[in-house]
């Protein structure tokens, strides 16, 4: 059976007053990515034809973040935050003629699973409106879902519920799915005759039932519905994201020697049989291929690590770092916007930025590519099978040819031809006996100084 055409609406207009922040709530990060990206990524699993983000507070920032995730995302602005139904209505001019289904998600609810959304779409074959519910450990003031089997009879707000209805633990998440034309028709009928004077999306269930249409409930784990309204909830969301990411990595065949100390980003990819040591942090945009090893206390972002490579301990890989197979990057090494070909070894205490290093080249301890002149960045090219001596300063732009060598302590300011040895340091001068005479002179000066102060 073919998948129906789907559109996606993500509500992202809330100010998030309780976050006590100038940043729009949906742009606070979980797993090194805005919460909005989590919602968009979950919705992506439905292969939506169109995606509309409803922005409000900080609309320009929200729009930039949405389009950074997917440049085809459309953004509309809810100038006044008058409730969730009012927010959905802002998408009507864009989607009113869209075929198929529409799913409404929330930009501050980052943990809805793709399989949950798939289940909602499947249930749409049996119900005009499908609501996502969850069994709450502490139902508190959540809206209650009054059901008969999977059929939803009504949604009752806590303040309006009887004691019997308050005993219900099946609660409303707010996520909803319906045929596109029907949803916008129902939304247009929602009123605001309530204490808050807002237009609530949940009212579409009662409106649908009044028309003789069926409503259903898809049930998910409570953790999927975790919303973020405070900094404490943001911290809880981060903890839940990391718990899930660690469990998924282990399930996928990755070795985590101390799982609770490894931190993932939303888009971290680790291949099977990769090994990750303790206290490793993955920022955005990291791919680690099968069989690679990341040792303790490394920080990685925007980099690609190929099969058999080893990184760390105490290494930092920054955006643009590309490590080919069997590369070794050791302790206290920083790589930025640099490509290291197969078998390159960078043992320790080195900075390689804006560089390309050919295969099987050895980079000695203390090597620095001096890539910045105070205004512009410049590139360093190092050929294959070269040997860069310890404490070499490579003042870019500069190149070192294949199988060339640089002497330890050299400052290389000119290109080094293939197979040449470059020495760029002052000649050593040795003065026999001078060390002893100097120490005697220094001690005499010190003693004279002490007598002068008495």
Curated annotation (Swiss-Prot):
Keyword list, A-Z: Acyltransferase, Cell shape, Cell wall biogenesis/degradation, Cytoplasm, Magnesium, Metal-binding, Multifunctional enzyme, Nucleotidyltransferase, Peptidoglycan synthesis, Repeat, Transferase
InterPro entries to which the protein is assigned, alphabetical: Bifunctional_GlmU, GlmU-like, GlmU_C_LbH, Hexapep_transf_CS, MobA-like_NTP_Trfase, Nucleotide-diphossugar_trans, Trimer_LpxA-like_sf
N-acetyltransferase: region residues: 253-454
Cofactor names: Mg(2+)
Binding site for Mg(2+): 108, 229
Catalytic residues (positions): 348
SUPFAM superfamilies named in the record: Nucleotide-diphospho-sugar transferases (SSF53448), Trimeric LpxA-like enzymes (SSF51161)
Gene Ontology MF terms: glucosamine-1-phosphate N-acetyltransferase activity; magnesium ion binding; UDP-N-acetylglucosamine diphosphorylase activity
Reactions accelerated catalytically: alpha-D-glucosamine 1-phosphate + acetyl-CoA = N-acetyl-alpha-D-glucosamine 1-phosphate + CoA + H(+); N-acetyl-alpha-D-glucosamine 1-phosphate + UTP + H(+) = UDP-N-acetyl-alpha-D-glucosamine + diphosphate
Enzyme class: transferase
Cellular compartments per GO CC: cytoplasm; membrane
Residues binding UDP-N-acetyl-alpha-D-glucosamine, per UniProt: 11-14, 25, 78, 83-84, 106-108, 143, 157, 172, 229, 318, 336, 351, 362
Pathway named in the protein's UniProt entry: Nucleotide-sugar biosynthesis; UDP-N-acetyl-alpha-D-glucosamine biosynthesis; N-acetyl-alpha-D-glucosamine 1-phosphate from alpha-D-glucosamine 6-phosphate (route II): step 2/2; Nucleotide-sugar biosynthesis; UDP-N-acetyl-alpha-D-glucosamine biosynthesis; UDP-N-acetyl-alpha-D-glucosamine from N-acetyl-alpha-D-glucosamine 1-phosphate: step 1/1; Bacterial outer membrane biogenesis; LPS lipid A biosynthesis
Cofactor remark: Binds 1 Mg(2+) ion per subunit.
List of residues binding acetyl-CoA: 365, 371-372, 390, 408, 425
Protein location: Cytoplasm
Segments for region (Pyrophosphorylase): 1-231
EC code(s) of this entry: 2.7.7.23, 2.3.1.157
Linker, as annotated region: 232-252
GO biological-process terms attached to the record: cell morphogenesis; cell wall organization; lipid A biosynthetic process; peptidoglycan biosynthetic process; regulation of cell shape; UDP-N-acetylglucosamine biosynthetic process
HAMAP family noted in UniProt: GlmU (MF_01631)
Function (record text): Catalyzes the last two sequential reactions in the de novo biosynthetic pathway for UDP-N-acetylglucosamine (UDP-GlcNAc). The C-terminal domain catalyzes the transfer of acetyl group from acetyl coenzyme A to glucosamine-1-phosphate (GlcN-1-P) to produce N-acetylglucosamine-1-phosphate (GlcNAc-1-P), which is converted into UDP-GlcNAc by the transfer of uridine 5-monophosphate (from uridine 5-triphosphate), a reaction catalyzed by the N-terminal domain.
Membership in a protein family: In the N-terminal section; belongs to the N-acetylglucosamine-1-phosphate uridyltransferase family.
Subunit annotation: Homotrimer.
Protein name, UniProt field: Bifunctional protein GlmU
Organism expressing this protein natively: Cereibacter sphaeroides (strain ATCC 17025 / ATH 2.4.3) (Rhodobacter sphaeroides)
Origin organism lineage: Bacteria, Pseudomonadati, Pseudomonadota, Alphaproteobacteria, Rhodobacterales
């Amino acid at each position: 059976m073919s998948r129906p055409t789907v559109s996606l609406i993500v509500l992202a207009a809330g100010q998030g007053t309780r976050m006590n922040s100038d940043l729009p709530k949906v742009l606070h990060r979980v797993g090194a990515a805005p919460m909005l990206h989590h919602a968009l990524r979950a919705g992506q699993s439905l292969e939506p034809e169109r995606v509309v983000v409803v922005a409000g507070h900080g609309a320009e920032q929200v729009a930039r973040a949405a389009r950074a995730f997917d440049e085809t995302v459309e953004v509309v602005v809810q100038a006044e935050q008058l409730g969730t139904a009012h927010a959905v209505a802002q998408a009507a001019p864009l989607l009113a003629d869209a075929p198929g289904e529409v799913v409404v998600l929330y930009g501050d609810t980052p943990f809805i699973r793709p399989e949950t959304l798939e289940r909602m779409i499947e249930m749409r074959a049996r119900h005009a409106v499908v609501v996502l519910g969850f069994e709450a450990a502490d139902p508190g003031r959540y809206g209650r879902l009054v059901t008969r089997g999977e059929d939803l009879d009504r949604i009752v707000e806590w303040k309006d519920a009887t004691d019997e209805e308050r005993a219900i633990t099946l609660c409303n998440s707010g996520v909803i799915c319906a045929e596109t034309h029907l949803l916008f028709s129902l939304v247009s009928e929602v009123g605001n005759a309530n204490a808050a004077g807002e237009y609530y999306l949940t009212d579409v269930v009662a409106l649908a039932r009044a028309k003789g249409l069926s409503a259903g409930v898809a049930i998910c784990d409570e953790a999927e519905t975790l919303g973020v309204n405070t900094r404490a909830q943001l911290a809880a969301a981060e903890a839940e994201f990391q718990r899930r990411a660690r469990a998924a990595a282990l399930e996928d065949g990755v070795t985590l020697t101390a799982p609770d100390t490894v931190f993932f980003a939303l888009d971290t990819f680790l291949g099977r049989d990769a090994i990750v040591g303790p206290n490793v942090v993955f920022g955005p945009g990291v791919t680690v291929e099968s069989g690679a090893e990341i040792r303790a206390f490394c920080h990685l972002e925007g980099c690609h690590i190929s099969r058999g490579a080893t990184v760390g301990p105490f290494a930092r890989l920054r955006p643009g770092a590309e490590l080919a197979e069997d590369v070794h990057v050791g302790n206290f090494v920083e790589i930025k916007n640099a490509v290291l070909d197969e078998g390159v070894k960078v043992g320790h205490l080195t900075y390689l930025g804006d560089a390309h290093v050919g295969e099987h080249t050895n980079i000695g301890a203390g090597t620095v590519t001096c890539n910045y002149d105070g205004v512009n960045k410049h590139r360093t090219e190092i050929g294959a099978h070269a040997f860069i001596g310890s404490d070499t300063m490579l003042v870019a732009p500069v190149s070192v040819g294949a199988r060339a060598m640089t002497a330890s302590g050299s400052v290389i300011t000119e290109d080094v031809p293939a197979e040449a040895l470059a020495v760029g340091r002052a000649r050593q001068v040795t003065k026999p006996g001078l060390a002893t005479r100097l120490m005697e002179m220094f001690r005499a000066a010190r003693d004279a100084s002490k007598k002068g102060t008495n």
